[in-house]
Amino acid sequence: MSYVISAANKIRDKIEKGNLVILESTSPPGTTRNIVGKIITSSTGLLAGKDYYLAFCPERVLPGKIVYELESNDRIVGGIDKKSAEITEDIYKTFVKGKIFLTDLETSEFVKLTENTYRDINIAFANELSLICRDYGIDVREVIKYANMHPRVNILNPGPGVGGHCIAVDPWFILENTGRKDTLIEKSRNINNNMPFIISERVTEIVNKYKEPRVEFVVSSKPRFNVANFYLFIISRKCS
Protein backbone atom coordinates (compact mmCIF):
# COMPACT_ATOMS: atom_id res chain seq x y z
CA MET A 1 0.00 0.00 0.00
CA SER A 2 3.03 2.27 0.18
CA TYR A 3 2.60 3.28 -3.48
CA VAL A 4 -1.05 4.25 -2.97
CA ILE A 5 -0.14 6.30 0.09
CA SER A 6 2.76 7.92 -1.76
CA ALA A 7 0.52 8.83 -4.71
CA ALA A 8 -2.13 10.28 -2.41
CA ASN A 9 0.48 12.38 -0.63
CA LYS A 10 1.80 13.71 -3.94
CA ILE A 11 -1.59 14.89 -5.20
CA ARG A 12 -3.16 15.99 -1.91
CA ASP A 13 -2.10 19.65 -2.13
CA LYS A 14 -3.24 19.85 -5.76
CA ILE A 15 -6.85 18.92 -5.07
CA GLU A 16 -9.39 21.71 -5.38
CA LYS A 17 -13.15 21.93 -4.97
CA GLY A 18 -14.97 20.08 -7.71
CA ASN A 19 -12.03 17.80 -8.60
CA LEU A 20 -12.48 14.06 -9.09
CA VAL A 21 -9.99 11.54 -7.63
CA ILE A 22 -10.12 7.94 -8.92
CA LEU A 23 -8.12 5.04 -7.50
CA GLU A 24 -7.61 1.98 -9.73
CA SER A 25 -4.92 0.13 -7.77
CA THR A 26 -6.13 -3.13 -6.21
CA SER A 27 -6.57 -2.35 -2.52
CA PRO A 28 -8.11 -3.72 0.68
CA PRO A 29 -11.70 -2.59 1.37
CA GLY A 30 -11.74 0.87 2.88
CA THR A 31 -8.53 2.10 1.25
CA THR A 32 -10.14 4.73 -0.98
CA ARG A 33 -12.29 6.13 1.81
CA ASN A 34 -10.01 5.77 4.84
CA ILE A 35 -6.56 6.28 3.35
CA VAL A 36 -6.80 8.29 0.11
CA GLY A 37 -9.77 10.36 1.27
CA LYS A 38 -8.35 11.09 4.71
CA ILE A 39 -4.92 12.05 3.34
CA ILE A 40 -6.54 14.63 1.05
CA THR A 41 -8.86 15.93 3.77
CA SER A 42 -6.06 16.25 6.33
CA SER A 43 -4.04 18.37 3.92
CA THR A 44 -6.73 20.49 2.27
CA GLY A 45 -9.67 20.40 4.65
CA LEU A 46 -11.84 19.36 1.70
CA LEU A 47 -14.39 16.61 2.34
CA ALA A 48 -14.89 13.78 -0.15
CA GLY A 49 -18.44 13.70 -1.47
CA LYS A 50 -19.00 17.30 -0.45
CA ASP A 51 -16.11 19.40 -1.74
CA TYR A 52 -14.57 16.95 -4.22
CA TYR A 53 -15.52 13.63 -5.80
CA LEU A 54 -13.89 10.32 -4.87
CA ALA A 55 -14.22 6.96 -6.65
CA PHE A 56 -12.66 3.54 -7.09
CA CYS A 57 -12.64 1.66 -10.40
CA PRO A 58 -10.51 -1.51 -10.39
CA GLU A 59 -8.48 -2.24 -13.48
CA ARG A 60 -9.37 -5.34 -15.47
CA VAL A 61 -6.58 -5.84 -17.97
CA LEU A 62 -4.37 -8.72 -19.07
CA PRO A 63 -0.67 -7.95 -19.70
CA GLY A 64 -0.13 -8.13 -23.43
CA LYS A 65 -3.74 -7.10 -24.18
CA ILE A 66 -4.00 -3.97 -22.07
CA VAL A 67 -5.42 -1.54 -24.64
CA TYR A 68 -7.97 -4.05 -25.95
CA GLU A 69 -9.21 -5.00 -22.49
CA LEU A 70 -9.16 -1.41 -21.28
CA GLU A 71 -11.76 -0.65 -23.93
CA SER A 72 -13.71 -3.92 -24.05
CA ASN A 73 -14.10 -5.16 -20.48
CA ASP A 74 -17.04 -4.28 -18.25
CA ARG A 75 -16.11 -1.97 -15.37
CA ILE A 76 -17.24 -1.59 -11.77
CA VAL A 77 -17.30 1.97 -10.43
CA GLY A 78 -17.64 2.65 -6.73
CA GLY A 79 -18.23 6.16 -5.45
CA ILE A 80 -18.13 7.69 -2.01
CA ASP A 81 -21.53 9.03 -3.05
CA LYS A 82 -23.85 8.66 -6.02
CA LYS A 83 -22.59 11.81 -7.74
CA SER A 84 -18.95 10.66 -7.56
CA ALA A 85 -19.89 7.35 -9.17
CA GLU A 86 -21.92 9.02 -11.92
CA ILE A 87 -19.19 11.51 -12.85
CA THR A 88 -16.65 8.70 -12.98
CA GLU A 89 -19.01 6.70 -15.18
CA ASP A 90 -19.27 9.62 -17.61
CA ILE A 91 -15.47 9.72 -17.94
CA TYR A 92 -15.08 5.98 -18.49
CA LYS A 93 -17.88 5.97 -21.05
CA THR A 94 -15.63 8.01 -23.35
CA PHE A 95 -13.37 4.99 -23.96
CA VAL A 96 -14.99 1.89 -22.41
CA LYS A 97 -17.14 -0.13 -24.82
CA GLY A 98 -18.19 -2.63 -22.15
CA LYS A 99 -20.91 -2.09 -19.57
CA ILE A 100 -20.30 0.08 -16.50
CA PHE A 101 -21.92 -0.77 -13.18
CA LEU A 102 -22.18 1.61 -10.22
CA THR A 103 -21.86 0.72 -6.55
CA ASP A 104 -20.17 1.98 -3.37
CA LEU A 105 -16.43 2.23 -2.68
CA GLU A 106 -15.97 -0.84 -0.50
CA THR A 107 -18.01 -3.12 -2.76
CA SER A 108 -16.00 -2.13 -5.83
CA GLU A 109 -12.73 -2.69 -3.95
CA PHE A 110 -13.92 -6.11 -2.77
CA VAL A 111 -15.08 -7.13 -6.25
CA LYS A 112 -11.52 -6.92 -7.57
CA LEU A 113 -10.15 -8.94 -4.67
CA THR A 114 -12.86 -11.54 -5.20
CA GLU A 115 -12.03 -11.90 -8.90
CA ASN A 116 -8.37 -12.65 -8.24
CA THR A 117 -9.02 -14.83 -5.20
CA TYR A 118 -11.46 -16.91 -7.22
CA ARG A 119 -8.73 -17.55 -9.77
CA ASP A 120 -6.19 -18.38 -7.07
CA ILE A 121 -8.52 -20.96 -5.49
CA ASN A 122 -9.28 -22.62 -8.83
CA ILE A 123 -5.58 -22.84 -9.67
CA ALA A 124 -4.91 -24.34 -6.24
CA PHE A 125 -7.61 -26.96 -6.79
CA ALA A 126 -5.96 -28.08 -10.02
CA ASN A 127 -2.56 -28.17 -8.34
CA GLU A 128 -3.82 -30.19 -5.38
CA LEU A 129 -5.44 -32.63 -7.79
CA SER A 130 -2.05 -33.09 -9.45
CA LEU A 131 -0.42 -33.87 -6.08
CA ILE A 132 -3.11 -36.38 -5.12
CA CYS A 133 -3.09 -38.03 -8.55
CA ARG A 134 0.67 -38.46 -8.24
CA ASP A 135 0.11 -40.34 -4.97
CA TYR A 136 -2.27 -42.68 -6.78
CA GLY A 137 -0.11 -43.00 -9.89
CA ILE A 138 -2.83 -41.43 -12.02
CA ASP A 139 -2.32 -39.01 -14.92
CA VAL A 140 -3.94 -35.80 -13.66
CA ARG A 141 -4.25 -34.28 -17.13
CA GLU A 142 -6.26 -37.26 -18.32
CA VAL A 143 -8.49 -36.96 -15.26
CA ILE A 144 -9.06 -33.26 -15.92
CA LYS A 145 -9.71 -33.83 -19.63
CA TYR A 146 -12.46 -36.34 -18.94
CA ALA A 147 -13.89 -34.45 -15.96
CA ASN A 148 -14.19 -31.33 -18.11
CA MET A 149 -16.44 -33.22 -20.49
CA HIS A 150 -19.16 -32.67 -17.89
CA PRO A 151 -21.14 -29.60 -19.01
CA ARG A 152 -20.77 -27.85 -15.63
CA VAL A 153 -17.13 -28.67 -14.87
CA ASN A 154 -14.18 -26.55 -16.01
CA ILE A 155 -11.02 -27.53 -14.11
CA LEU A 156 -7.83 -25.66 -14.96
CA ASN A 157 -4.55 -27.36 -15.79
CA PRO A 158 -2.05 -27.70 -12.92
CA GLY A 159 1.16 -25.71 -13.07
CA PRO A 160 3.87 -23.90 -11.10
CA GLY A 161 1.48 -21.95 -8.89
CA VAL A 162 0.59 -18.31 -9.42
CA GLY A 163 2.75 -15.67 -11.08
CA GLY A 164 2.43 -11.94 -11.44
CA HIS A 165 2.01 -9.25 -8.84
CA CYS A 166 -1.76 -9.47 -8.21
CA ILE A 167 -3.20 -12.93 -7.68
CA ALA A 168 -0.55 -13.99 -5.19
CA VAL A 169 -1.19 -10.90 -3.05
CA ASP A 170 -4.87 -10.01 -3.32
CA PRO A 171 -6.27 -12.96 -1.30
CA TRP A 172 -4.37 -11.69 1.74
CA PHE A 173 -6.12 -8.31 1.37
CA ILE A 174 -9.43 -10.10 1.88
CA LEU A 175 -8.25 -11.82 5.04
CA GLU A 176 -6.03 -9.25 6.71
CA ASN A 177 -8.68 -7.46 8.78
CA THR A 178 -11.00 -10.40 9.44
CA GLY A 179 -9.05 -12.43 11.99
CA ARG A 180 -10.13 -15.59 10.16
CA LYS A 181 -7.69 -18.51 10.23
CA ASP A 182 -7.37 -21.81 8.39
CA THR A 183 -9.61 -20.63 5.56
CA LEU A 184 -10.00 -22.02 2.06
CA ILE A 185 -8.36 -18.82 0.82
CA GLU A 186 -5.31 -19.28 3.05
CA LYS A 187 -4.94 -22.97 2.18
CA SER A 188 -5.14 -22.18 -1.53
CA ARG A 189 -2.40 -19.58 -1.15
CA ASN A 190 -0.16 -22.10 0.60
CA ILE A 191 -0.71 -24.73 -2.10
CA ASN A 192 0.18 -22.34 -4.90
CA ASN A 193 3.14 -20.88 -3.03
CA ASN A 194 4.62 -24.35 -2.62
CA MET A 195 4.21 -25.47 -6.24
CA PRO A 196 7.44 -23.91 -7.62
CA PHE A 197 9.43 -25.77 -4.97
CA ILE A 198 7.59 -29.04 -5.62
CA ILE A 199 8.24 -28.74 -9.35
CA SER A 200 11.88 -27.83 -8.83
CA GLU A 201 12.33 -30.90 -6.62
CA ARG A 202 10.85 -33.10 -9.34
CA VAL A 203 13.12 -31.52 -11.94
CA THR A 204 16.07 -32.19 -9.64
CA GLU A 205 15.07 -35.85 -9.34
CA ILE A 206 15.02 -36.21 -13.12
CA VAL A 207 18.24 -34.25 -13.66
CA ASN A 208 20.12 -36.30 -11.08
CA LYS A 209 19.56 -39.41 -13.17
CA TYR A 210 21.97 -38.06 -15.80
CA LYS A 211 25.69 -37.46 -15.72
CA GLU A 212 26.74 -33.82 -16.13
CA PRO A 213 23.21 -32.59 -16.92
CA ARG A 214 22.65 -29.22 -18.57
CA VAL A 215 19.32 -27.61 -17.87
CA GLU A 216 17.72 -24.46 -19.23
CA PHE A 217 14.31 -24.04 -17.72
CA VAL A 218 11.91 -21.10 -17.79
CA VAL A 219 8.27 -21.00 -16.76
CA SER A 220 6.10 -18.15 -18.02
CA SER A 221 2.66 -17.35 -16.66
CA LYS A 222 1.62 -15.51 -19.86
CA PRO A 223 3.26 -17.45 -22.71
CA ARG A 224 0.63 -16.42 -25.28
CA PHE A 225 1.47 -12.75 -24.89
CA ASN A 226 5.24 -12.97 -24.39
CA VAL A 227 4.91 -11.74 -20.81
CA ALA A 228 7.12 -13.83 -18.57
CA ASN A 229 7.11 -14.39 -14.83
CA PHE A 230 10.18 -16.46 -14.18
CA TYR A 231 10.73 -19.24 -11.66
CA LEU A 232 14.17 -19.90 -13.13
CA PHE A 233 15.95 -18.65 -10.01
CA ILE A 234 14.21 -21.31 -7.92
CA ILE A 235 14.83 -24.14 -10.33
CA SER A 236 18.45 -23.30 -11.03
CA ARG A 237 19.16 -22.97 -7.33
CA LYS A 238 17.60 -26.34 -6.60
CA CYS A 239 19.41 -28.03 -9.48
CA SER A 240 22.86 -26.60 -8.82
Residue ranges and their predicted role:
Residues 1-240:
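Structural/interface elements that position substrates and couple domains in central-metabolism enzymes
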